[in-house]
Design a protein with these regions (language model features):
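Catalytic cysteine-centered active-site loop
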Residues: 53, 73-125, 135-136, 177-178
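...with weaker cross-activation on analogous glycine-rich loops/strands in unrelated enzymes
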Residues: 2-8, 14-16, 35, 102-162
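Catalytic alpha/beta core of large soluble enzyme barrels
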Residues: 161-171
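N-terminal secretion targeting segments of exported proteins
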Residues: 1-58, 184
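Short, low-complexity, Pro/Ser/Thr/Gly-rich segments in the mature regions of secreted, periplasmic
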Residues: 175-184
Length: 184
């Protein structure tokens, strides 16, 4: 098929498709009945998501996506905030949030005091999640911070895996979960 014939055929198909969709829209075919599409103002306001939460959710997704670029980056306790060659848990969260204009304190304990409390059941992507784990843990003190990545997963760094994604609802992370904070 030569280029001219191909182009003519493509234009004909495109024009026919456009005319067909226009006819469907003009007749109302493929749309919901008026009664089904009518929604009271009260129902809309009760179920609506505020612009702030949509923006925060979008920023949370951006924070997590940016953090995923560092998967496998090694862990070092007390890591300097001036390098991305290695992180500890709180320098990692501090670094990835700073890219999106959120200035977090340096330590996981200090980070656990900013923002507002949020239940585990109401976590949104980008929320900070805190644990009492490791040799310094007593079950009540914050020793670790992660970022909620959605679908029951956390993005964080610790030990030999370095920056990694873990399941919040199993193993050590389920047992040592303390609380969560929303900073977006």
């Amino acid at each position: 098929m030569n280029k001219q014939h191909w182009f003519k055929q493509a234009m004909t198909i495109g024009l026919c498709t456009t005319i067909g969709f226009s006819a469907l829209l003009a007749t109302g075919a493929g749309t919901a009945p008026a009664a089904a599409s009518a929604v009271s103002a009260d129902a809309v306001s009760a179920d609506s998501v505020s612009a702030d939460s949509v923006s925060a959710s979008s920023t949370g997704s951006k924070v997590v996506s940016f953090g995923k670029k560092y998967l496998g980056t090694r862990y070092q306790f007390g890591a300097s905030t001036s390098t991305t060659r290695y992180f500890d848990c709180s320098s990692f969260t501090q670094y990835i949030f700073k890219k999106y204009g959120v200035d977090l304190p340096r330590t996981s304990v200090a980070q656990s005091k900013v923002g507002k409390s949020v239940s585990k059941a109401n976590l949104r992507v980008g929320d900070l999640v805190f644990f009492s784990s490791g040799s310094r843990a007593n079950g009540k003190n914050v020793t670790h911070v992660a970022v909620y990545a959605g679908n029951g997963k956390i993005l964080h760094t610790y030990g030999s895996p370095g920056v990694t994604i873990s399941d919040l609802n199993s193993g050590n992370w389920k047992k040592t979960y303390l609380k969560s904070r929303r900073v977006l």
